[in-house]
Amino acid sequence: MLQSLNHLTLAVSDLQKSVTFWHELLGLTLHARWNTGAYLTCGDLWVCLSYDEARQYVPPQESDYTHYAFTVAEEDFEPLSQRLEQAGVTIWKQNKSEGASFYFLDPDGHKLELHVGSLAARLAACREKPYAGMVFTSDEA
């Protein structure tokens, strides 16, 4: 039985640039680095940055909706969003869903999101205004 997401490994084209972005700009804790990689954490999530010479930047309009969303406290959302904008990140989407969200790219074009909210809050909003064809399968969350 699956218990949780163990780790996320992201292929990067410039390890130093990525470590600076993920550690210094986003604030993940840096635990170790080596010639071709680094281990960081965000809460209980372990993130591995792995240098890969085959990694190529993919413009957001040429890729799908797959993205990685990180929980942010409500009071930290605006300051962090502004810091990212001031750092010149590329914004790939405007928020149109429940809860505050800021959608941006990392240096390699991985789609990321800052999000204020929880699954429980999202489901409550969906119960008020369900998506087309939405069926609820449990009362949990």
From Swiss-Prot:
Transferase listed as a keyword: yes
Activity regulation info: Requires the monovalent cation K(+) for optimal activity.
Documented EC number(s): 2.5.1.18
Top-rank EC class of the record's enzyme: transferase
Keyword set, alphabetical order: Antibiotic resistance, Cytoplasm, Manganese, Metal-binding, Potassium, Transferase
InterPro entries named among the record's database cross-references: Fosfomycin_Res_Enzymes, Glyas_Bleomycin-R_OHBP_Dase, Glyas_Fos-R_dOase_dom, VOC
Molecular-function annotations in GO: glutathione transferase activity; metal ion binding
Pfam family, one: Glyoxalase
Cellular compartment(s): Cytoplasm
Binding site for Mn(2+): 7, 67, 113
Result of changing residue 7 to A: Strong decrease in fosfomycin resistance
A biological process term (GO) from this entry: response to antibiotic
Cofactor requirements of the protein: Mn(2+)
Ranges for domain VOC: 4-117
Record field: catalytic activity: RX + glutathione = an S-substituted glutathione + a halide anion + H(+)
GO cellular component, one term: cytoplasm
Function, as annotated: Metalloglutathione transferase which confers resistance to fosfomycin by catalyzing the addition of glutathione to fosfomycin.
Self-association and partners: Homodimer.
Annotated PANTHER family: FOSFOMYCIN RESISTANCE PROTEIN FOSX, LYASE, PUTATIVE-RELATED-RELATED
Family: Belongs to the fosfomycin resistance protein family.
Protein name: Glutathione transferase FosA
